[in-house]
Amino acid sequence: MPAAIHRPARTLYCGEVRPAHIGQTVTLYGWIDRRRDHGGVIFLDLRDRSGIVQLVADPQKTPQSYPLAGEVRNEYVVRVTGTVQQRPPDSFNPRLATGEVEIYAEQLEVLSPVGKQLPFSVSGEEAEEVREEIRLRYRYLDLRRERMSRNLQLRHRVIQAIRRFLEDEEGFVEVETPILTRSTPEGARDYLVPSRVNPGEWFALPQSPQLFKQLLMVAGVDRYYQIARCFRDEDLRADRQPEFTQLDMEMSFMDQEGILELNERLICHIFKTVKGIHLPRPFPRLTYAEAMARYGSDKPDTRFGMELVDVSEVFQGSRFKVFAKVLAEGGLIKILPVPGGDEKISNTRIKPGGDLFKLVTQYGAGGLAFIRVRPDSLDTIGALKESLSPEQEKRLLDLTQAKPGDLLLFGAGPAAVVNESLGRLRLHLGQELGLIPENALNLLWITDFPMFEFNAEENRLEALHHPFTAPHPDDLADLKTARAQAYDLVWNGVEVGGGSLRIYQREIQEQVFQAIGLTPEQARDKFGFLLEAFEYGTPPHGGIAYGLDRLVMLLAGEDSIRDVIAFPKTQQARCLLTGAPSSVEAKQLKELHVASTYQPG
C-alpha cells in the first residue's frame, strides 16, 4: 500500500479571509476560478462554496509555487499554503468580501487536474448563457457556479431556520413518515412500486404525509413537523417536479386562528433570519369568494390594482343583446379597468385573432368587449355604444373609477369563466404594462374555500383540497355546498402553503367520502385504518404544508424550482445527469412478477 499522504488541515474557507488575518499563514483548499499573468506575476482566484480569494505567485517572493502556478488551469483542485497580505490600495476589489487581501502562495499542490475540456465555463457571465439541458447534464459543474451555490446554501438556511423555530420555540417534534405506503384514490397519479414479497400487490410513493400526520395526532404527538419528500406523477410545469419537498406540519387542540398566528410567526422568522426582512403582522386575509370576485383568482397578486368590477346591475334590461342574454342565463358582467390602456392597447389585440382575445378565449370566454375612455366620451363598438344611455355611462365610470385614457375590458358569462379569464388577463397586462412593483412583498391568507368542486368528466363532486378537510360547522346541513375550514398562504400571486382543520369524527368523514362518490365499501377498503383510528379518541387537529422548493425559489428570486434543487428532473421527468428513468433487466421484472406491454415506436 502507498504511504498515507499527510496534508495541512484547512485553516479558513476562501471567502473568510479578511484584513484581520494579515500576516498569518493559512491553508486553503478549492478550485481555480481564474488565472491571470501580469508582467511575470501570476494571480490565481481560488474558489470554494464560501467565495473567492486572490492568490499571488511571484518568481522572487514565492519561487517554490511559481512554476506550478503557471501550469494550473480553471477548475483544477488545489491546496495552497501562504501568508495573508494586504492588497495595494489601488487594487482593492469592492465586489469581493476578500477584496482587500491576497495570499502569497508559498506552497501550491494540485490535488486533481481537469483532464477534459470543460463543457461550459463555470465562472463569469458566460456561465449564465449555457442552455439548461447542458447545465443539467453536468449538474456537478453547474452547482459550482456562484449563483447555484448561493441557492443551495439559502435552501439550507431556510430549513435550519424552520427547525430552530419549530423545535426550540414551539415544541414541535420531527417525525419521519413512510415512503412506501398504499395508493389512495384522490389527488394526482401515484408513483407505484411493485412488491416482490407480495406478488401482484403494489406500494405507492406518498403524494403527501397527510394520513400519517393525522394518525400521529391520534397517537398524541401533539405537534409534528417533517421536511417531507413527496411524489406526484403529473404533467410538469416550471414550478413542478415529480419528486419535491414540503414542510409538513400538524397540530392538536388548535383552532384556525391559532394555526394562522403560529404560521405567520414562522414565516416572519424565516424572512428575518434568511433575508433580514421584517414583515408586518397580521397578514391580510381574503375569503375565497372575495378573492375570486375582486381578482379572478384564489391566489391573487395584490401588489397592484386593476381589480375586477361587477357591472351586471348597469346592464339589467340592456338593449345590448349579448349582455342581456348572459344576464338572463344567470351569468354576470365584469370590467377589468386598464389604466392608460387606451393608448397602449390597440383594437387589433382585443378583436378576434389578437393576442388578448386568444388569451381570454383559452379560458372559456366568448370574446372581449371594450370601452375606451376619452376626455369627452366613451368609445366602443357600435352595438354596445348605441345601447348605452348617459346614465349607464356615468354609472360605469363611477363603478370603475375610470379616467380619460383608460381602457375598460369586459367579461360576460358564467361567473367561473368571467373570473378566470379576466383574472388571467389582469396578470398578463399587469406584467406587460409594468404595473407590478418587483420589490414589493405581499403575503395574505385566503380562507373559506368551497369544500367541493364539480368534476364534469366524471360527473361527480371532488374535494377542492382533499377529503380530510373539515367543513365549516355552520354548513354541516348541506355538505355539497359547504365551506371548508381551509386556508392558503399566497405570496405575490403564488400559493406557497395550504392547510386546513381536519375531520376527526368518523361519521362526518364517512359523509364526506359519500359526497365524493365513494361507497361505504370503497371507503373502508381505502381508508378503513383511518376510520377505525377515529374510534379511539381523536383530538381536534389541523395543519399546513408548504412547498419548500417554491418557497426557496421565491426567496432566491429565481423563476424555476429547478434552480433551487440540487438534482432536479426536466419537464419530461428525466434526470439528464444519470439517465433516469431507464430500462431494467428482464430478470428484475421477472422477480417482481411484472411484464412490460410497451412497444417502442
UniProtKB/Swiss-Prot annotation:
InterPro entries: Aa-tRNA-synt_II (IPR004364), aa-tRNA-synth_II (IPR006195), aa-tRNA-synth_II/BPL/LPL (IPR045864), Asp-tRNA-ligase_1 (IPR004524), Asp-tRNA-ligase_1_N (IPR047089), Asp/Asn-tRNA-synth_IIb (IPR002312), AspRS_core (IPR047090), GAD-like_sf (IPR004115). GO terms for biological process: aspartyl-tRNA aminoacylation. It is found in: Cytoplasm. Its main location: cytoplasm. Pfam families: GAD, tRNA-synt_2, tRNA_anti-codon. SUPFAM superfamilies: Class II aaRS and biotin synthetases, GAD domain-like, Nucleic acid-binding proteins. ATP binds at residues 232-234, 241, 495, 547-550. GO terms for cellular component: cytoplasm. One of its GO terms (molecular function) is aspartate-tRNA(Asn) ligase activity. Keywords: Aminoacyl-tRNA synthetase, ATP-binding, Cytoplasm, Ligase, Nucleotide-binding, Protein biosynthesis. Transmembrane segments: none annotated. L-aspartate binds at residues 186, 232, 465, 502. Gene3D superfamilies: Bira Bifunctional Protein, Domain 2 (3.30.930.10), GAD-like domain (3.30.1360.30), Nucleic acid-binding proteins (2.40.50.140). Residues 210-213 are annotated as: Aspartate. Its EC number is 6.1.1.23. Homodimer. Aspartyl-tRNA synthetase with relaxed tRNA specificity since it is able to aspartylate not only its cognate tRNA(Asp) but also tRNA(Asn). Reaction proceeds in two steps: L-aspartate is first activated by ATP to form Asp-AMP and then transferred to the acceptor end of tRNA(Asp/Asn). This is Aspartate--tRNA(Asp/Asn) ligase.
